[in-house]
């Protein structure tokens, strides 16, 4: 660090804190997928295909999540339908 | 150890990371040497079949005759393939094959070699290849403990988390429903000056994200390259911060309390700071 660095503004968040924030999000996301069964992506695709027979939706409009609690598993399916015109 | 039936006291420790180039082999060599220096009979196995390098780091590359795959295929006995370290008593190296690929490793083959080693050794260090494929999975499958080598950098931290997931689901201990593999975080190539400037993830940042116990922090050090140039494990360089930090990590691995050190920025003189040196 030379003498000119002392005049630089220090207002922006440090790159290390940006790195930490990004990592916390991606790691949490990947951990939540870790315990999902292998068939889930394919099942998600098939569900999308069925819905698409009737409504025009994109892949990102369907969210599927499997949550395991102590005594049961909950499959949560979230479909965002396009606005009706 | 989590091998079949017979109870031996050998402890199998995998040194792993997911990402390549973070210091697995350097750490395997240093930690294996450190454990042997404490008087425990130790063997370091190079699992990086096809890309062997532990022999170079340990300075025994010209003494390799037979390798791990030869032993698995019964083309050589274990005692023919084991290389006795010239500097450290109680330390042996089992080199990887340079001419085969990772498919030469089988669960049964690896298990057979580990069972034979466990009769004779207290510590078996498995130096994992990079990646999360077969070679890395073989290296961790029978482990009792794992040292996850991580650099304070986004891709390394993410890959370490991936490998933690594999340790928890695809190891023999996980498959058998036994007590899980003991996990240890080893942070390497740490640069306290850059952390202070907010340019590098800090120890506590990485601990927060990975949430596993910290075994040690190895500062970025010129001594590491110098040691590998010479084929000497860096832990033997007791004038270097990296060597001392590895020894601290070995002490902690053996259950001793050691405070962290070398995490503070070294103060530079005023003139040096002014000139940006």
UniProtKB/Swiss-Prot annotation, chain A:
Pfam families referenced in this protein's UniProt entry, alphabetically: MinE
Keywords assigned by UniProt, alphabetized: Cell cycle, Cell division
Keyword Cell division on entry: yes
Domain of life: Bacteria
InterPro entries noted in UniProt: MinE, MinE_sf
GO biological process entries: cell division; regulation of division septum assembly
NCBIfam families for this protein: minE, PRK00296.1
Family: Belongs to the MinE family.
Function field: Prevents the cell division inhibition by proteins MinC and MinD at internal division sites while permitting inhibition at polar sites. This ensures cell division at the proper site by restricting the formation of a division septum at the midpoint of the long axis of the cell.
Name of the protein this chain belongs to: Cell division topological specificity factor
């Amino acid at each position: 660090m030379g003498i000119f660095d002392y005049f630089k503004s220090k207002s922006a968040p440090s790159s290390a804190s940006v790195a930490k924030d990004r990592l916390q999000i991606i790691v949490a996301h990947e951990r939540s997928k870790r315990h999902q069964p292998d068939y889930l992506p394919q099942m998600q695709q098939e569900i999308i295909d069925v819905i698409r027979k009737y409504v025009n939706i994109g892949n990102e409009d369907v969210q599927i999540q499997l949550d395991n609690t102590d005594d049961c598993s909950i499959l949560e399916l979230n479909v965002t339908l396009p606005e009706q015109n | 150890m989590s091998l079949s039936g017979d109870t031996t006291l050998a402890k199998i420790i995998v040194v792993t990371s997911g990402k390549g180039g973070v210091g697995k082999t350097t750490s395997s060599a240093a930690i294996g040497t450190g454990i042997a220096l404490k008087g425990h009979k130790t063997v370091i196995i190079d699992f990086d079949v096809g890309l062997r390098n532990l022999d170079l780091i340990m300075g025994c590359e010209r003494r390799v005759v037979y390798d791990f795959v030869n032993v698995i295929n019964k083309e050589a006995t274990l005692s023919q393939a084991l290389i006795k370290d010239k500097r450290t008593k109680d330390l042996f190296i089992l080199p990887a094959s340079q001419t085969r690929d990772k498919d030469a490793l089988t669960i049964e083959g690896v298990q057979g070699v580990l069972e034979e080693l466990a009769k004779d050794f207290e510590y078996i260090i498995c130096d994992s290849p990079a990646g999360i494929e077969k070679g890395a999975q073989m290296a961790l499958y029978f482990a009792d403990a794992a040292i996850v080598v991580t650099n304070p950098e986004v891709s390394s931290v993410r890959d370490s988390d991936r490998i933690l997931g594999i340790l928890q689901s695809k190891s023999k201990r996980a498959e058998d429903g036994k007590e899980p593999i003991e996990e240890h975080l080893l942070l390497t190539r740490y640069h306290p000056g850059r952390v202070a400037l907010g340019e590098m993830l800090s120890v506590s940042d990485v601990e927060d994200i990975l949430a596993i116990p910290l075994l040690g922090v190895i500062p970025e050090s010129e001594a590491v390259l110098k040691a590998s140039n010479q084929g000497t494990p860096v832990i033997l360089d007791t004038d270097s911060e990296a060597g001392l930090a590895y020894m601290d990590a070995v002490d902690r691995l053996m259950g001793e309390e050691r405070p962290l050190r070398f995490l503070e920025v070294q103060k530079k003189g005023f003139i040096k700071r002014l000139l940006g040196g």
